[in-house]
From Swiss-Prot:
The gene is prtT. The keyword rRNA processing does not apply. Coiled coil: none annotated. SUPFAM superfamilies: Zn2/Cys6 DNA-binding domain. It is found in: Nucleus. This is Transcriptional activator of proteases prtT.
């Protein structure tokens, strides 16, 4: 079948590029034929594009876009090559018509690159600041002790921000005790005042007089109490809170007192102290003595949560600044007399306690330098004692430790010997060998241990740091085992934290070290009851060692509180090696409570710390 199409039925409409040119259909094939040449029907823009392109774009047959801000095309600018544009009068006018105002506002590629470089520099600086302010924990296995204290705060000097890498030994030990022994009891909500019933106390009067004598003998030097008459005069206490606090501290030397009586005494004292802190100013000197004693021994009873010594000493320091007039003068303006000696001794004890618990809990230290300058003035008086010098030396030691811990550069350098510590040793060398039972060396080794553990957060695999941690931990425990029981019972709570932290480090790195069992047994024999700090430290060390030895991978250990069924009592000594003799059942004589520790309990290789180390327990934080 054939279809015929006439010319009139098929018409093509082709747009004309020029009004003077006409396009017609030549035949029925559908092809058009122009009466002008091919050049006349091309768009004008295509002709001008070839004339305005630079030499490089023309050779490469690429689009040549002229940068409105310069005399070069964008391709040549991005490649940073010379751009040769033809000299035409229409070039700039044509480019201005092609680019809109929005296009002209776009910066060049080079400027955008410069902006990106500046942004990357700022971002890198911000990332470094974030790293400096956050704990850096390596991807290696973290031990049981590490997981117990991952959140960090730390001590600082004069209100500076806490260091991001400082350990928290006191907080760590308290968390481990809550884990192993259960959470402490919640204190009753009711409060008590210093009424007549509080003044009389819950102890028998004759027993109270005996306790006051024991207090003067073992604790009085801390707060300038040399005679029972300083506390109890004319059959009446000079200050009820001081009197009751003295009896409470001395009760550890008389283990026959029922624990329920001691607990009731402790709760009344605690409530009274809270009420007194909000009394009108200025505060009595005797009351400040009692608050200082409670700051030094905050964990007398462990059934309830211990008093926060950092907070208690801080508030007491504020009261002392108001009550002690000499603190508002320059140190050289006043002469140190007998009255000022007693107040300076109290002031130094508060400052030292604030420093120790600020570092131990990784909290700020806010005492201004002008107040700290009064501390050494106590040594100017002829009545200054060895303990006074030791206290001033410890204040200087903890200040140096706090400054070093808050210097990230020094901690990252992982130094083995610190110049500031060495200068301190030279300055106080006469006190380091002054008395056999002095705790000054314990504090020195403890501060060094903290610095090494802080540095290990940046270089946790450093063998020299591990060796120094073990060496200082062994020195602390070995020195402590040489102390008489009667002397150890009078140690402030900070000393027990030092010994406990050293034992935990040994458990963390080398749980088979024999010193662990020896110090655990020593603490258990030392504790007069299960509520004493020594007993709880002994059990914490025992339980942590058991977990470290039984669990090859610390991360697989399950954290949880254990009930009373897992707790030990003083009659169950079968879980420990026979290092010391069995405790005596008759406590009628106080001397029977204070046996000597034989020298053979110390290890022969005191300085040999290159023994077998378990890599799984080399932690970044303790």
């Amino acid at each position: 079948m054939t279809r015929t199409t006439t010319l009139e039925e098929v018409k093509f409409e082709i747009p004309t590029w020029d009004n003077n040119n006409h396009i017609e259909v030549a035949d029925g094939s559908g092809r058009s034929e122009s009466n002008a040449s091919g050049d006349t029907i091309r768009p004008k823009g295509r002709i001008r594009r070839s004339m305005t392109a630079c030499n490089t774009c023309r050779k490469l047959k690429t689009r040549c876009d002229l940068d409105p801000r310069g005399h070069a095309c964008r391709r040549c600018l991005s490649l940073r090559i010379e751009c040769k544009l033809p000299d035409t009068a229409e070039r700039f006018q044509d480019n201005a018509s092609m680019w809109s105002d929005a296009t002209a506002a776009i910066p060049s590629i080079e400027e955008r690159l410069n902006s990106l470089e500046r942004s990357m520099t700022e971002m890198t600086s911000m990332m470094r600041q974030m790293v400096d302010r956050s704990p850096s924990i390596s991807g290696s296995s973290v031990s049981l002790l590490t997981r117990s204290g991952l959140t960090e705060e730390t001590a600082s000097v004069e209100g500076s921000q806490p260091s991001f890498i400082a350990p928290r030994p006191i907080r760590l030990i308290q968390e481990l005790q809550s884990d192993f022994l259960g959470e402490p009891n919640v204190l009753p909500a009711e409060s008590r005042s210093l009424s007549e019933s509080f003044s009389n106390g819950v102890l028998d009067p004759k027993l109270s007089l005996k306790l006051i004598q024991l207090f003067v003998e073992h604790f009085g030097s801390w707060v300038s109490i040399d005679s029972p008459s300083d506390i109890h005069n004319d059959l009446r206490p000079t200050d009820p809170l001081l009197y009751r606090t003295a009896c409470l501290l001395a009760s550890r030397y008389v283990p026959g007192i029922p624990s329920s009586v001691i607990q009731a005494e402790y709760l009344q004292i605690r409530h009274a102290a809270v009420n007194i802190l909000w009394n009108s100013q200025p505060m009595k000197y005797e009351t400040l003595q009692a608050l200082t004693l409670l700051s030094l021994w905050p964990t007398t009873i462990q059934k309830e949560a211990p008093m926060d010594s950092w907070l208690l000493s801080g508030i007491s320091i504020n009261h002392a600044i108001i009550s002690f007039d000499f603190l508002n003068h320059a140190p050289a303006e006043l002469i140190v007399d007998n009255d000022m000696v007693a107040k300076l001794r109290l002031w130094n004890a508060l400052c030292l306690t604030q420093l120790q618990f600020a570092i131990g809990n990784a909290r700020p230290f806010h005492i201004q330098q002008r107040y700290l300058e009064h501390c050494p003035r106590l040594l100017e008086h002829p009545a200054a004692t060895f303990d006074d010098g030791k206290m001033v030396a410890e204040i200087q030691l903890y200040l140096v430790t706090s400054k070093l811990q808050n210097d990230p550069h020094r901690m990252r350098s992982a130094e083995i010997e610190y110049e500031e510590i060495e200068r301190w040793k030279m300055e106080w060398a006469h006190l380091l060998t002054g008395e056999q039972h002095s705790t000054l060396e314990l504090n020195l080794w403890y501060c060094q241990l903290l610095l090494y553990r802080t540095a290990m957060k940046c270089q946790w695999e450093s063998e020299p740091l591990v060796s120094e941690v073990l060496r200082n931990a062994r020195l602390i425990i070995s020195k402590f085992l040489l102390v008489r029981f009667s002397t150890a019972l009078g140690f402030v709570d900070q000393t027990y934290y030092i010994v406990g932290y050293a034992a935990l480090n040994l458990c963390d790195f080398n749980p088979m070290d024999p010193l662990i069992d020896q110090v655990q047994t020593f603490l258990l024999h030392l504790s007069p009851n299960e509520d004493h700090i020594a007993y709880r430290f002994s059990y914490t060390i025992s339980e942590l060692k058991r977990r470290c030895t039984a669990c090859p991978n610390p991360n697989s250990a399950v954290k949880g509180a254990f009930g009373d069924a897992r707790k030990l009592n003083l009659g169950q000594l079968h879980f420990m090696p026979q290092v010391l003799d069995t405790m005596m059942g008759d406590y009628s004589a106080l001397e029977q409570l204070m046996p000597e520790v034989s020298p053979h309990s110390l290890p022969d290789m005191l300085n040999n710390v290159t023994g077998e180390l378990q890599a799984g327990y080399r932690t970044a934080i303790l």
